[in-house]
UniProtKB/Swiss-Prot annotation:
Entries under Pfam families matching the protein: PPE, PPE-SVP
Keyword Disulfide bond recorded: no
Subunit architecture: Interacts with human TLR2.
Name used for this protein in its record: PPE family protein PPE26
InterPro entries named among the record's database cross-references: PPE_C (IPR022171), PPE_dom (IPR000030), PPE_sf (IPR038332)
Biotechnology and industry use: Candidate for development of a vaccine for the control of tuberculosis.
Keywords: Virulence
Family affiliation: Belongs to the mycobacterial PPE family.
Cited function: Probably plays a key role in regulating innate and adaptive immune responses through human Toll-like receptor 2 (TLR2). Interacts with TLR2, leading to the subsequent activation of the mitogen-activated protein kinase (MAPK) and nuclear factor kappa B (NF-kappa-B) signaling pathways. Stimulates macrophage activation by augmenting pro-inflammatory cytokine production (TNF-alpha, IL-6 and IL-12p40) and the expression of cell surface molecules (CD80, CD86, MHC class I and II). Also participates in adaptive immunity by directing Th1-polarised immune responses.
GO process annotations (BP): response to host immune response
């Protein structure tokens, strides 16, 4: 199209009759919003994939996922840049229109020029309006040239503004053949599971049937040999009574072995009771008591022979301070009320307490070794210190 061949009425009417630059401004705003959304999505994708593949999800599957998503993230970043470029070009097109609109002659001026020319021509009877008609024609020519120049400039600016990079198709991040491969794998797994279930259902009765017979019925296995050595039969017992019968020899052996110490102690007790009954033990006790009395008669002479005074002894009497009984270390020497041991202490037989029951292996344990447990120093021992009572002086 040659804008120079069109009269100014056409060019001016076209510029003033259209929607103006509002659609291009709206398009620029929309492209800006799309660019921002694509950029935000690309940044979010990259952040999430990086955190997921480096912290929460590791391994070959994570690496494959990150490698597959990387081209798509790059495409979104490129698309965001292209959308920003489109917004810039749309703003440039709107600016070009505004410039062309400002340079275009308004249609009312062109219409006024044409009306003035027609009036001058109609009244030019004697040629008196020739100069005015020429001036009107010259003004119209200038309007034509101005509109043509504005349209040529607008066409050039629009051509530059429309030069945008075309958008590319987003990459395919999923394997097109993966769905078929997955379906085949699922079918194979289902077939394997079905065959396994069939084998299990078929083999279950056989396994249960094998439990109805003794486990060691065969005499060739190593367990059969072991059972033969222990119990003299290669067959495993099929009932509790048969098992107890096989274990009877071992039970008797363990019972006799465990009861052997009790048998020895019982025999010893029987011998002691028999000796008491026959008087072998009771007749020796008076002789021992008499011998002890004879030995005690020589105690007074022992003190004189050693150069000391007569031996004094007291039994069952504590030292006293006033009417209070005190330890011997508080009162010094024994009081004069204690008679010297001129005569031996009377010795008499002391009968033992009657035996409540015959002795056994599980009698009292000897505690003689525990007598000195508190005498020596002990680690971590904290002695108890008692305050001196007021009556002690």
């Amino acid at each position: 199209m040659d804008f120079g061949a069109l009269p100014p009425e056409v060019n001016s009417v076209r510029m003033y009759a259209g929607p103006g630059s509002a659609p291009m401004v709206a398009a620029a705003s929309a492209w800006n919003g799309l660019a921002a959304e694509l950029s935000s999505a690309a940044t979010g994708y990259e952040t999430v994939i990086t955190q997921l593949s480096s912290e929460g999800w590791l391994g070959p599957a994570s690496a494959a996922m990150a490698e597959a998503v990387a081209p798509y993230v790059a495409w979104m970043s490129a698309a965001a840049a292209q959308a920003e470029q489109a917004a810039t070009q749309a703003r440039a097109a709107a600016a070009a229109f505004e410039a062309a609109f400002a340079a275009t002659v308004p249609p009312p001026l062109i219409a006024a020029n044409r009306a003035s020319l027609m009036q001058l021509i109609s009244t030019n009877v004697f040629g008196q309006n020739t100069s005015a008609i020429a001036a009107a024609e010259a003004q119209y020519g200038e309007m034509w040239a101005q509109d043509s120049a504005a349209m040529y400039a607008y066409a050039g600016s629009s051509a530059s503004a429309s030069a945008v990079t075309p958008f590319s198709t987003p990459p395919q991040i999923a394997n097109p053949t993966a769905q078929g491969t997955q379906a085949a794998a699922v079918a194979t797994a289902a077939g394997t599971a079905q065959s396994t279930l069939t084998e299990m259902i078929t083999g279950l009765p056989n396994a249960l049937q094998s439990l109805t017979s003794p486990l060691l019925q065969s005499s060739n296995g190593p367990l059969s040999w072991l059972w033969q050595i222990l119990f003299g039969t290669p067959n495993f017992p099929t009932s509790i009574s048969a098992l107890l019968t096989d274990l009877q020899p071992y039970a008797s052996f363990f019972y006799n072995t465990e009861g052997l110490p009790y048998f020895s102690i019982g025999m010893g007790n029987n011998f002691i009771q028999s000796a008491k009954t026959l008087g072998l033990i009771g007749s020796a006790a008076p002789a021992a008591v008499a011998a002890a009395g004879d030995a005690a008669k020589g105690l007074p002479g022992l003190g004189g022979m050693l150069g000391g005074g007569p031996v004094a002894a007291g039994l069952g009497n504590a030292a006293s301070v006033g009417k209070l009984s005190v330890p011997p270390v508080w009162s010094g020497p024994l009081p004069g009320s204690v008679t010297p041991g001129a005569a031996p202490l009377p010795v008499s037989t002391v009968s033992a307490a009657p035996e409540a029951a015959p002795g056994s292996l599980l009698g009292g344990l000897p505690l003689a070794g525990a007598g000195g447990a508190g005498a020596g120093p002990r680690y971590g021992f904290r002695p108890t210190v008692m305050a001196r009572p007021p009556f002690a002086g």
